[in-house]
Amino acid sequence: MKPFKLLLVLLISFVLFTSFSTEFTVKDKIVILAHAGYVSHYSTGLKYPVEVEWWDTKARLGCTTKFPRKDQFAPDPLLPAETSLADDYSGSGFDRGHMCPAADNQCDSEFLTECFYFSNMAPQYHSLNAGVWKTLETRTREFAEQLDSVKVWCGNIGSVSKIGEVSVPAKCWKVIYIKKTKVWEAYVFENTKEQSKKLDQLKVKVSDVEKLTGFKFKP
């Protein structure tokens, strides 16, 4: 039995979303969904996760045989009515952008299935999803493979438009903490079609992300 799985069935708590960035114009309900491979703070109003967190480790990433990615996107069984979003994304022109990426989960079939829940997705322009966002995902895995344990937090903020009932976030962000070296890195990405900046140009202070989101990051 995996650690988070012990809490899986009904570890759902509701928080009135009043302390987060003023970019949110309405009070919003956030549902905490604890899965075996990640925890999602999912907005029922925006229909995307405002924060997702997990640990990348050598053990998590280091298998010799990986499960194949099948792209079976699905509602989250902990919150199916709020995460049945396949039709909203279909034909929208936006990628179903993973927060906890598939490549972090291919050593465990349960992890891989869970990471395709819509509670782990946000609409991203392909240029972001396949560009600097993917570059940072790879960088994070390399840190974990070399230095053993990396805590990852990432999420989305704001709403510039909608695809069906799903808000398109204005920004995406990620914070990582490397346990062995006690090094932190933080990034904020504009969710726009044109992506001209390199990853290093998007680096910010952790305190900047805390101010933007209202989250306090502690490993």
PLM regions: where:
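Short, surface-exposed charged micro-motifs
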Residues: 30, 39-41, 174-176
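Short, His- and charge-rich active-site/binding loops that engage polyanionic ligands
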Residues: 33-95
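Domain-level detector of nuclease and nuclease-like folds
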Residues: 77-219
